């Protein structure tokens, strides 16, 4: 046998083997996934047009190679279609994984179920809801997933009035929706592993059972297939694009090709039916020859391109390997059969067979997604389930070499394809500016174009020789339906009927549902149509048509490009002098301007010394713009400016004159064909263009009936130009046509908009100055002008009204202290203020006279143990030397030796207080006195407050206390001012009342032990110190470091009284304490010398406007100030906002095209345009310029106490006020219970000076010191380290007073000085026996002042009671605040704290102190024992009488129940008539309890009288809890029968008497024993009845609120709309709130946004970005809501209100200027629609919320000022009220918006 014969025989056997294998695999693949899809429309008999179904045009109006459009069905709301599920799934098995495929066009804006599948129990198992937010409902036999887990595709909107191809794939636990073959969304589907869908029920089309919403719209195809991958191929296999032919033979012309292989499937697209027709078997398998295979190579590639099952990124997980066309075995088996086994249906095999038999199609090379590297062997088909398992094909020689997708076919031409050129770069978008587009006349005919490329592929060639026999085809799809059969049996559901013969069947809810199912299953007799057939194959491209006749002159074209700028025109004539422009509006605050004009003279201040010449300050803030001046003369024309940057694209200019004809362009090379774009929306017809050469076939238009070709008619007139349509997709480039003849000149176009201004003309000559015009409207803000000259001082204006509170201005410079005013009259005591922050410590005052013995203070905390000093006897008291001038700081001196011991002097009698002497100059420091002998060691005293040693400050005079003024409301705390200069000491005032104890200060650092102090007299018993034996007096040790704070020791016993020590030396000034609040003003200090100029401080925040003060007297006219330096010219301010658009001028003639000029100089301001229409209500404007101060207004009323302000900075120490009048002494209150230990307080404010103490023991006179002369002013040195204390020197002899030295710099504020010497000890009281707690007494008057102790936790404010006995020893308290200032001693170093002296004798009554701060709420005290009952109180105020209820019908008499507890006591009635038998029992006076038992809360009632209105319980106090009823008192003598009830003729029902009489008849006289109790019972019953009436029919008042307005309307249908109180949680009515009830709308409950959320005015918002939430704006915030009284609403109440609500609505009004709010007419979309944020933080928009509607959409057209009203009416209550809004359409030059937020209304 010849070699070629052997090879050919082997090859034939090989081909047969391959074919057999392929057919075997295909057959198995069909078994796996080849089940025919279920055609729902066919099963439901849509093609016979049941009720509510009609035929209409479908998805494609025309298809390639098809005359007729697709047929779809229009479904209206009358359609009621259903069928048994088994009719659709005859096998009774619904696939576990499946695809639902449908092509629909729902009615715009609808949302309804397209398919509902129920099981035999009436439970919906499957549903597809389509519309604005599609939902896939699935519930298997286990009830999974639950409804809240149904997949919701909220980002998809298929109810937009357009056709959509939707495929849903359900595989395992995911559901994927593919819309229009592009958008793919996958959601989890939480179903069971083996979920089952029952097919024993029915399927309902277009709705759900018992639901009113039905599907309305068009549907073309509706399939369910058991292949979950079919959804991915929906647009390839089931519903191809309109420009593709069906991949099977066209079903619209059914025939069987003579070459058709077996099992070619014909898909009919006529109306969504699938005709499964098997072609006749071809008996002979065609032989595949080499020629056929060679021809087939391109077809296989091309046809596989049509079955691209996803992009490479989706399915290809590794790059394909390049495989050469080697002779490897089984290429088809490896390359294709794997794909077929995966379940891909018939099309791939069909195309292989079809192309082998029909001839080939040229390879295209433009769409091959699967060809990556160029050879055919690089096809990688993967099974869908196994994306990672790659099977590589190895092509055999018989397939030939593949062609790479990248290859350009320029060298070869395969089957008539022309060479494709490379695609050119995309051109820049044209920018046509006004004046640039000048349309010329048509040019002359151009030269003939270049030879065009070869045409598109021609028709298929003749059939080739019969090929080898192909493999057996797959089994065909089921055949077409047969004739309708006889009516089938109805679906019978076995129902269990209950009841007997006389009663109808008992129907359960499920059976009723199933009956509804049966009613909807009545249209199950006719056979439904099948699915649509496949699209036909694309037809050949037609050849070029003949040249058309010359067209008529076209309409005016669009404006041409802007011409080159022409040369400047001739100089214009001088214009007339224009009128001055109108004043501009207030601009935005500019940059800091130059120095402003001098303001009006203020009130003259106190004459001060001339200060230093100030340095030049930094540039100040901008001044307010001045009024516009008269327009200046025109300046000379400036030099030509440099060229500016290209301006923005301008408006379309007027049509220019035609330009010369241009040269014909070179023909472009045909680019490759681009991918098919989506079909754009149908545009409106554009203007007719000139006839062009025929282009390639465009997108199919709507298919009309094909008429016979008519003869050419006469030339018609050009029609009117239509509106421009939307840009369609770009067509393929056509061939270059020949240039046509020049057309006739078209008519002039319409007047275009005004073009850009031309170049600036030459300056004209000055015109004649015109008359001054009237003042125009206020223009917009101009730039800030330069500072003008100072104007003349104007006349004093009249007194203006008090203006509203301005915004906080910057902090002004500190003013000088004014003169001290006369004390005003004492006002009434104000309310007690809140606890203020402790003030700064004051300067130490002089030692006052000895105070009276105070009450025992609270025990202080244990201080640190001081070093034990050597007790000396009291030395002689030296005379006080004159205060010397402050010297410079000396070096640390050595510790002096102790002085000689002095003798103790005797106590002198207390002398009378001396008159106030003049303030002497400060004397020099005395020498240390001689050391005294050691005295007896006293018991350990309380440790003192060791302070860190500061520098010694000047001793100030103590000013007299001022009179108590009216306690005003607590003002906001001001910011801390700088520390002022220290004033001269004032003279000591008379003693003031001791204030309340200050809060404890923080513990200071431990100070060094001071010098040895003089022993004092025995003090009161101190608290026991730390335990330890007392040692002998040791020598003074060196100062130790500060120890840590030790733990609090146990409470010690009272120590024995120590001797009284003399006053120690004044301690040094300590560190400044924490800043306290500003104290009351002190007296005016002497005028200090001006300090040096400080640096410029930062501008403080504006202070809050205080109340209007009293008008001060007019001061003398001040002398004119010096002229200030002229300020520098400030920088130009910011650009003002754009002015109103002027009127359009007439169009100018087109200028010659000149070169682009440089930007000219800015022209002068134009005149203001005419006044525009009334604009919409604007927001509040920016704050206007601050006006000049008017004269003082009238005295305002005293305001209410304001809220506490923020803590201000420390102000200057004010002058001390004059002494106030002494207040009356109140009785001493009882000791309070010990409060819990409070936190350490801050340092207390300076207390008033106490009365002068008794004279101390006389000390030995020291040697006189020499008088020091006034030293020079010392500079303030740095604070040095604390030196060790020196021993006290002997006092010097009083020297002559030195001269006053110059005033030094202000020193730091010192701590208060040490306390003065304690008074003599009083007798120690014994612990009294605790008495019974009495009733709360009336608050006592304030007691005499006690020593400052630690403030306990504030108790409730009470008046001071009478003095109680001294209490037992209290717990050890925390360390107290530093005491009041001690007497002025000679300056020395701080000594150790001496032992506590005994209590002094009670002093005279002190003056009343300034009211202290309000304490915080203390813990409630223990409950006292019940006191004896008081006398019967006066009757309480009558309660609010409820509205009388309607009179009820007479009820049946009830039995008398057990005697209940006594009810609320009514108001005492008039005395009743005495009974005939016996006198009534005596009225118990005074509520003395009867002997029979304990006293109940109410006393025994008085004699019954006729009922008055129900009173409140008690004597106008709050109602307490009801107590147990007391035992009844002894019964009075019996009254006549029935008389008990007579006093209650109104309150008691009529049946009561009869009922009582019947009981009396049965029970005899026993009932009379309870006459008093019965009246209380009936009163209680009546009260209960009224309460129940109020609960059933609430009145909507604050005390009787309703749950919602709907409840109120149901209770009182005649109530008008208005404001009512509601309490949704129905608890205590104290949390009720007031709402607006809209009964007209059905009882809506409405709440309102707060003032700042009501809306914003129309503005351009230049600094904000579109697409931002309003809360992110600089001036934005989240929207919040209040009740109608402006109070915030409790969150719990809002939650209850929403629980009681079925739907809620809220309106939102968007005010716009050229800005869209909802629908955009220009783009035809909702892309820029508003978005809202609901209260549940859920975003609401057009796409995801069908409950938002535009009631009026004026902003859609973007024309001028309009508004859009949007209503959110939703059953999702949590979305309302909205709390934020996103605005998307603003930012352009003319766009503005504002909005108004309406109330949120809830309807129950």
Curated annotation (Swiss-Prot):
Q: Where does the secretion signal sit in this chain?
A: 1-34
Triple-helical region as annotated region, ranges: 528-1540
Q: Which terms are listed as keywords in the entry?
A: Calcium, Collagen, Disulfide bond, Extracellular matrix, Glycoprotein, Hydroxylation, Metal-binding, Repeat, Secreted, Signal
Composition bias, kind Low complexity: at what positions? 447-465, 477-494, 639-655, 715-726, 873-901, 916-925, 969-979, 1084-1108, 1383-1392, 1417-1426, 1453-1462, 1509-1519
Give start and end of each Fibrillar collagen NC1 domain: 1575-1803
- For region Nonhelical region (C-terminal), the annotated ranges are 1541-1561
Q: Report the function annotation for this chain.
A: May play an important role in fibrillogenesis by controlling lateral growth of collagen II fibrils.
What is the annotated quaternary arrangement, including any partners?
A: Trimers composed of three different chains: alpha 1(XI), alpha 2(XI), and alpha 3(XI). Alpha 3(XI) is probably a post-translational modification of alpha 1(II).
The entry's protein name is Collagen alpha-1(XI) chain
- Which gene codes for it? Col11a1
